[in-house]
Amino acid sequence: MKRSLLKTCSIIAGATIIFSSLSISRNPLEVQAASMRSASEIVQEMGVGWNLGNTLDAKITNLSYNTSPISFETGWGNPVTTKAMIDKIKNAGFKTIRIPTTWGEHLDGNNKLNEEWVKRVKEVVDYCIADDLYVILNTHHEGNWVIPTYAKESSVTPKLKTLWTQISEAFKDYDDHLIFETLNEPRLEGTPYEWTGGTSESRDVVNKYNAAALESIRKTGGNNLSRAVMMPTYAASGSSTTMNDFKVPDDKNVIASVHAYSPYFFAMDTSSNSVNTWGSSYDKYSLDVELDSYLNTFKSKGVPVVIGEFGSINKNNTSSRAELAEYYVTAAQKRGIPCVWWDNNYAETNKGETFGLLNRSTLNWYFSDIKDALIRGYKNVHPEATEDDKPSTDVTNPDSGNTKPDSGNTNPGTETTTPTDNEKISITSKINDWGGAYQADFTLKNNTSSDINNWSFKIKKNDIVFTNYWDVKITEENGYYVVTPQAWKTTILANSSIVISIQGTGKVISNFEYKFD
């Protein structure tokens, strides 16, 4: 996810933490490749998880290669990770820990990893393995060199493969509780395309980087021959464009990875459009539609999916945050999708990316109500973890209280181009029909040689009900939806296109009527 407050939201300065002296009883080398479970089997067991955020992923560019690992680990203000900290997560009922890890700062001029850094990462992984937790180990905050363009591909790929070869060798004998994740949110950082679905080129290169990392992992042998490997879409985005363009290598143990801080205006937004409450039938239905899009898209590609990051920030609205947390996890578990809460140990009210749940210095919970809600969400579907409690793919209709079976069919989309009265911009729409709900993807093409800023257009309502959107703001005016961009979508570069996605319910319209002011 976007981390604009990484250094400023460091917490608990001056706290003194001592390494735990607890022994680690589990042997992470005890499972051989022949007994490694499939990715699909593992996903069914991962449950609800927790991110050790802003810790091993602290990107400190002014520290030298030989700086002690602990200086990096605590560089953004978080305390040293201890076994007691991991025990706290385990005892709360979480089943998975994601360990975001930055490696680029620990490569020398020959792209060799610092052995002390590898040793420290293994130590933290071992804390988790000892507690029978699933562990997601990734490459995080590598965007300064993992740049998804054709121009950079030839230089990035060898370095990425060398990095993953070294990581894989270090962990090749760990059992199937360890899951690798090739990349975090690979994207065109600092460009208008960063959080808007990228370009066809960048999405293609992300697929190639994923495949290159997987190839390096498999070549190291041992348990890595069949280890579950997570792979993100472009920017780990759950938009229809990024998911549809996600390519799965010919490998039965791949897991798709998306990040879903949903709904955005409740979960992350701090602007004047922000909302502080959640829980209506409309809210729940919108989230169900979004989760169905993940399930159906990746099911059609033959892979399971994990939501590697989700959560909501502190706006002094704990009750609504807890309600969303429970519903989110329950709905995801019904669809067989594990969710991993992003925790950066920052919990102040109305201070930006305040996702913290556990105070890592005191080992007390900032928000025990939210923690309990997350675990309840899992237990709602798995009350006793019996055979009868396996996740289903039922879709809940919040208005009726009944469930309907997932048809398993996804309309790949019908595409139409509608002439507009604005020669500068043309619009193409593509409809992905899920049955009872749909997603409309609008491609806006700038037909001029100059950038277009602050665009807007109207869509005739025609009995349409739009329910969910992130990149735009929508108001109603004289029988039209008025669509205006969020700040990150205001510019359409010269001779370029952007894509916006709007989800809706009811009648599916194949030919929208557009109008420019």
From Swiss-Prot:
Residues 382-392 have a biased composition (Basic and acidic residues). Residues 1-25 form the signal peptide. Optimum temperature is 43 degrees Celsius. GO terms for molecular function: beta-glucosidase activity; cellulase activity; polysaccharide binding. The active site is at residues 185, 309. One of its GO terms (biological process) is cellulose catabolic process. Optimum pH is 4.8. SUPFAM superfamilies: (Trans)glycosidases, Carbohydrate-binding domain. SMART domains: CBD_II. Keywords: Carbohydrate metabolism, Cellulose degradation, Glycosidase, Hydrolase, Polysaccharide degradation, Signal. It holds the Pfam family CBM_2. Its EC number is 3.2.1.4. It comes from the Bacteria. Residues 408-420 have a biased composition (Low complexity). Residues 382-424 are annotated as: Disordered. Hydrolyzes barley beta-glucan, lichenan, carboxymethylcellulose and xylan. It shows preferential activity against the larger cellooligosaccharides (cellohexaose and cellopentaose); cellotetraose is the smallest substrate degraded completely. Belongs to the glycosyl hydrolase 5 (cellulase A) family. This is Endoglucanase A. It comes from Clostridium longisporum. The lineage of its organism: Bacteria, Bacillati, Bacillota, Clostridia, Eubacteriales.
